[in-house]
Amino acid sequence: MNFGLSLIFLVLVLKGVLCEVKLVESGGGLVQPGGSLKLSCAASGFTFSSYTMSWVRQTPEKRLEWVAYISNGGGSTYYPDTVKGRFTISRDNAKNNLYLQMSSLKSEDTAMYYCAR
């Protein structure tokens, strides 16, 4: 009886490990005001094309701000007024990648940027 319960628990744990969601951001750096930067996010562990995705940022004051949203197929995007016209979110579902093109950067754009599912 105990062996059976242990086996079920082990299978569930292993299944969870195999399905670990990973989002790995890259492309950050130091840029002068007015400059541009493109961020990338490599996704794994889930069916990327089935999910809407977003970029969020944490300011030096530790405030969390939503930056951009894109629908699962990429046809719809939304931005707050603070970045509208300067930031562009896009995705490549074949490569499981999310992107954020940032231009006309301002000092208030200084933050840690994260992709989110």
Curated annotation (Swiss-Prot):
Disulfide bonds join 41-115. Residues 1-19 form the signal peptide. Residues 86-117 are annotated as: Framework-3. It holds the Pfam family V-set. Residues 50-54 are annotated as: Complementarity-determining-1. Residues 55-68 are annotated as: Framework-2. SMART domains: IGv. GO terms for molecular function: antigen binding. One of its GO terms (cellular component) is extracellular region. Residues 69-85 are annotated as: Complementarity-determining-2. Keywords: Adaptive immunity, Disulfide bond, Immunity, Immunoglobulin, Signal. The keyword Signal applies. GO terms for biological process: immunoglobulin mediated immune response. Residues 20-49 are annotated as: Framework-1. This sequence belongs to the VH7183 subfamily. This is Ig heavy chain V region 5-84.
